[in-house]
Amino acid sequence: GIPCGESCVFIPCVTTVIGCSCKDKVCYNN
């Protein structure tokens, strides 16, 4: 639920390495 400051519209989330995932075109961490 916490925004990771990254979008995932065109490319995947780089922040997946710290637990973030793509939701609604924005990367979130829980």
From Swiss-Prot:
Query: What does the PTM comment of the record read?
Result: This is a cyclic peptide.
Q: Which cysteines are joined by disulfide bonds?
A: C4-C20, C8-C22, C13-C27
Q: Which organism is it from?
A: Chassalia chartacea (Chassalia curviflora)
The reply on keyword Disulfide bond is yes
Source organism, top-level taxon: Eukaryota
The domain comment in this protein's record states: The presence of a 'disulfide through disulfide knot' structurally defines this protein as a knottin.
**Keywords for this protein:** Disulfide bond, Knottin, Plant defense
Instruction: Give the protein's biological function.
Output: Probably participates in a plant defense mechanism.
Q: Does the entry feature the keyword Disulfide bond, yes or no?
A: yes
GO aspect biological process, one term = defense response
- PROSITE patterns membership: CYCLOTIDE, CYCLOTIDE_BRACELET
> Crosslink Cyclopeptide (Gly-Asn) sits at which residues?
G1-N30
Protein name, please?
A: Chassatide C9
Provide the family line. Belongs to the cyclotide family. Bracelet subfamily.
Q: Which residues cross the membrane?
A: none
